[in-house]
Amino acid sequence: MKKLYGVIGNPIGHSMSPDIHNASLKDLGLDGHYHAFKVEENDLEDAVKGIRALGVQGINVTVPHKVSIMDYLDHIDESAKVLGAVNTVRREGDKLVGYNTDGEGFVKSLMKVLDKPISELSFLMIGAGGAARAIFTTIVRNTPKKFDICNRTLEKAKRLTEATPSFHNKEVLSIKEAEERLEQYDVIIHTTSVGMYPNVDDVPLSLQRAASSAVVCDIVYNPIQTALLKEASQKGLKTLDGVGMFVEQAALSFQLWTGQEPNIEKMRSIVIGKLGGTEC
């Protein structure tokens, strides 16, 4: 009998997860199917009961359920406990266990463009939401030289820095302060929705003072090359688009469910094809 996998969220109609996971199942000769399920917030508990009853082997969790689903699972892995959010659920016997692959997915994509270890680099992150939390806590485990956060709401950024009390080389900045200090950073990571379709001309901050050796990352992947990444490319800076994080976190979920490693480059090609884009 086919094993069933899927993604739950709302909205979910434009999810590319079924495309990449079904292609990976087919490539590896695994008898399974991955389906997108639209689940309203007030239907989440019933949806989890359905997942149990139907014997679903694995589920990805997206907006708005990443936090609330934790109430309905049997166990939460340390990766998700630290973040206070779940993006992957795996059936383990008769138990449903929650994981989070977002932070590790970003770091895996980042490591492909770095020429130094994280411990030798200074980071600036723009944003303090759920994705920012995953990225910050994962990178900090690798003890960077410095990791500052800038956000429109300083209090929200401050709360995020407090999630890692043992890491001290961190500071909360306004956007203006970050722009003035930009030359200090080796890696600049944008984690908000600024520049996402349809507002494709928006940028979160100016890269005017960025160091010539800086790497600029944007987790937005629609468009693939955001206005921020275009500005970085025009300055001759190395860039990392959001497709990398999306594909790497998906691959980690796939491995959790099947024990097998999917073809990352094929996943990436599918996503780029669906977006109608080209590589940066």
Swiss-Prot record:
Give the EC number: 1.1.1.25
- Which pathway does UniProt place it in? Metabolic intermediate biosynthesis; chorismate biosynthesis; chorismate from D-erythrose 4-phosphate and phosphoenolpyruvate: step 4/7
Q: Which reaction does it catalyse?
A: shikimate + NADP(+) = 3-dehydroshikimate + NADPH + H(+)
Q: Which GO terms describe its biological process?
A: amino acid biosynthetic process; aromatic amino acid family biosynthetic process; chorismate biosynthetic process; shikimate metabolic process
Please name the catalytic residues of this protein.
Answer: 66 (proton acceptor)
GO CC, any one term? cytosol
Q: Which key words tag this protein in UniProt?
A: Amino-acid biosynthesis, Aromatic amino acid biosynthesis, NADP, Oxidoreductase
In terms of Pfam families, this protein maps to: SDH_C, Shikimate_DH, Shikimate_dh_N
Q: Gene3D superfamilies, from UniProt? A: Leucine Dehydrogenase, chain A, domain 1 (3.40.50.10860), NAD(P)-binding Rossmann-like Domain (3.40.50.720)
Q: Where does shikimate bind?
A: 15-17, 62, 87, 102, 221
Residues annotated to bind NADP(+) = 78, 127-131, 151-156, 219, 242
Sample GO molecular function, one term:
shikimate 3-dehydrogenase (NADP+) activity
Q: Is-annotated flag, keyword Amino-acid biosynthesis?
A: yes
What is the role of this chain?
A: Involved in the biosynthesis of the chorismate, which leads to the biosynthesis of aromatic amino acids. Catalyzes the reversible NADPH linked reduction of 3-dehydroshikimate (DHSA) to yield shikimate (SA).
The similarity comment for this entry is:
Belongs to the shikimate dehydrogenase family.
Fill in the subunit field for this protein. Homodimer.
HAMAP family (alphabetical) = Shikimate_DH_AroE (MF_00222)
Name by which UniProt lists this protein: Shikimate dehydrogenase (NADP(+))
